[in-house]
Amino acid sequence: CAKGNYKLQPNGIEVGVSEVWRIPTDSTAIFDGKQREVCKEKVTTHGDFYILDRGTYEVRVGVKVKIPANCVGLCLPRSTINRLGIIKSETALWDSGYEGFGTQTIHVPIKQFKIHKDENWFQLIFISNESPSELLYEGHWQNEAPKRPFP
């Protein structure tokens, strides 16, 4: 279900991130029903750390996820993120058949958040369907991937 750098836990899979972007305070997600991308500023690491100032960010998980026909997937924050006061927006459901390096949104309400680039930020959980889904995800975000390989 996950391929890449991860840590298996009793009830999920811990994952890090491969890319981080700052979402501007003014943004347009959909225009004329066609535009899907928001102009965002890519955040680079400072040495071995991401340093995120107060604001909202989109982060790409650092593993390729493949949701089987008999499951749905969720991506939740690790307790470390919660304890630091970082707010993760509610996750979108990863449908049966989704495959790719999904993204999540976090909000940094504190002055600054510093985290090692190899730290695991999220935990993926998979929930079994009552029966395998006959309809599999084939949407716009299928096979989304980082611009560069995750180490």
For the regions a language model picked out, list residue spans one by one.
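DUTPase catalytic domain/fold
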Residues: 1-151
